Regions:
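Thiamine diphosphate
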Residues: 1-105
Length: 105
């Protein structure tokens, strides 16, 4: 359905592992909206460590300060920073109206 709006929601750990999809989307002029939930954790890895390694965590906390807006822009996408939940609806509307690849952080 190429005429449909595509919104993908991922944590920052997932986005770090798969962010090359943004470069592919911009190269192919795809109107994709990527929402990044920045909780500073490799969530799935941590979940597996909780379930199978008795809560012994290794390298799952992401303490660095990656600027995902700048990263999006470096890949040719539009980056929009959302700092309050009250801003989210307007940011999503703006992203849809832009009809391009957008990363909401």
């Amino acid at each position: 359905n190429p005429d449909k709006v595509v919104i993908n929601v991922a944590g920052d750990g997932c986005f770090r592992m798969n962010m090359n999809e943004i470069a592919t989307a911009t190269r192919n002029n795809m109107p994709l909206i990527q929402v990044v939930i920045n909780n500073h954790v490799l969530g799935m890895v941590r979940q597996w460590q909780t379930l199978f390694y008795d809560h012994r965590y290794s390298n799952t906390v992401l303490n660095d300060k990656v600027d995902f807006v700048k990263l999006a822009e470096a890949m040719g996408a539009v980056g929009i920073r959302v700092t309050k939940k009250e801003e989210l609806a307007d940011a999503i509307k703006k992203a849809i109206d832009l009809i391009t690849t957008v990363v909401l952080v």
